[in-house]
């Protein structure tokens, strides 16, 4: 049954599987959903946005937030929500608020393309396969990346933390700050296990130019950071 759901699986390599019909992926990208929400709010007059306007500091009076300093002036406000992900600790530093979050490298390798789905009009052809024992997953990229297969790995033993100050290091990044150079030796063992579960990856070979280390926002307890800080009210 697992093979029927995910034809790329070697059923001899597993003892069993679970199927979650309610699981899903945001396609083509989660950014599209966020952009839709932002534009909808702007059209209703409920939101104003300031693009290409970096925050460079905060105004704080009597341990309470009073404004956001930008390179174009100050925005007066009594509430600030930090939603900058991997850059969150840097924003916290500007307000004197420690944010217990660290960027962690997340290897993403691309294989193919897979002839059976190359040229498809679908964003996703097969269900996403999670190998929990290997802390990894395999999914196809549909038409978004021309039928490539994506393998992602979560380092569960010795995660590679990245200093937030080092995110934009030009010697370590590729086409964007959150895409870092990949060292295949660091993931050789889990990748070999992936070849056993999904041999098609080894047959197709990996695309070095498309593969990279992404960055995840990770907290010490893997939970969310929600609520007002004890150091600065309204922050």
Tell where the protein language model's regions lie, with residue ranges.
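Short, intrinsically disordered, charge-balanced linker/junction segments flanking boundaries
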Residues: 1, 232-235
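Flavin (FAD/FMN) cofactor-binding and adjacent substrate-gating region
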Residues: 1-39, 43-44, 50-51, 57-64
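Conserved residues at the C-terminal ends of beta-strands
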Residues: 21, 71, 112
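Helix C-cap/helix->beta junction micro-motif
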Residues: 44-45, 95
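Hydrophobic beta-strand scaffold residues
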Residues: 48-49, 99
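Active-site substrate-recognition segment that forms the wall
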Residues: 57-64, 74-233
């Amino acid at each position: 049954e697992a093979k029927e759901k995910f034809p790329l699986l070697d059923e001899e390599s597993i003892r069993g599987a679970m199927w979650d019909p309610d699981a899903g992926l945001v396609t083509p990208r989660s950014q599209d959903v966020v952009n839709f929400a932002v534009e909808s709010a702007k059209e209703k007059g409920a939101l104003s946005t300031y693009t290409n306007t970096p925050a460079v500091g905060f105004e704080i009076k009597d341990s309470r937030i009073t404004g956001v300093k930008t390179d174009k002036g100050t925005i007066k406000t009594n509430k600030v929500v930090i939603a900058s992900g991997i850059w969150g600790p840097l924003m916290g530093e500007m307000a004197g608020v420690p944010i217990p979050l660290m960027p962690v490298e997340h290897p993403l390798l691309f294989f193919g393309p897979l002839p059976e789905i190359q040229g498809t009009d679908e964003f996703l052809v097969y269900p996403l396969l999670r190998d929990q024992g290997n802390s990894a997953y395999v999914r196809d990229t549909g038409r978004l990346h021309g039928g490539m297969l994506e393998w992602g790995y979560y380092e569960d033993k010795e995660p590679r933390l990245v200093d937030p100050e080092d995110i934009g290091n030009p010697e370590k990044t590729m086409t964007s700050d959150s895409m870092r150079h990949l060292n295949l030796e660091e993931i050789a063992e889990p990748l070999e296990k992936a070849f056993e579960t999904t041999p098609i990856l080894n047959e197709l070979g990996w695309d070095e130019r498309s593969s990279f280390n992404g960055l995840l926002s990770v907290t010490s307890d893997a939970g969310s950071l929600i609520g007002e800080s004890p150091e600065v009210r309204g922050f």
